A protein has these predicted regions:
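Hydrophobic beta-strand positions
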Residues: 12-13, 63
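Forkhead-associated
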Residues: 19-93
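Regulatory inter-domain linker segments that are low-complexity and enriched
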Residues: 1-10, 94-121
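Polar/charged alpha-helical tracts
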Residues: 17-18, 55, 105, 115
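Short linear motifs in intrinsically disordered
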Residues: 1-5, 10, 17-21, 78-79
Length: 121
């Protein structure tokens, strides 16, 4: 999906690859076949789900992953969590950052943020 087509104005940046995923529909975070694939053996095949809300926000769910899902170093429980720009999602040893895209120009020219878990603690 092109960043310009994103209705929510949010993107998720994967630290290990620098890939930016716009969040225009429900996406699964996990290994290999997931929409947001993370190359990390501590990540479950279907680890977590991120989805846009009708009010323009985002929500994150853990999918009963073996090692848990963390947001800003706090473990996500069984209830979904509303995300904000700047939140850092950690699955396994990998971090993903929530980015807010505020205008069409920014959507086209936003730099890619790449960070490892040890860089954000």
């Amino acid at each position: 999906m092109n960043v310009r087509d994103d209705p929510t104005g949010y993107a998720l940046v994967v630290d290990s690859t620098g890939e930016r995923h716009t969040i225009g529909r429900k996406l699964v975070i996990g290994r290999e076949s997931a929409e947001i694939a993370v190359d990390d053996l501590e990540v479950s095949r279907r680890h977590a789900t991120i989805r846009p809300l009708d009010d323009g926000g985002l929500e994150l769910y853990d999918l009963d992953s073996a090692n848990g899902t963390f947001v800003n170093d706090l473990r996500l429980g069984s209830q979904p969590l509303r995300l904000e720009a700047g939140d850092v999602i950690r699955v396994g040893r990998s971090a993903l950052r929530v980015e807010r895209l505020t205008s069409a120009a920014e959507r086209e020219h936003l730099p890619t943020v790449i960070r490892r878990k040890d860089e954000i603690q």
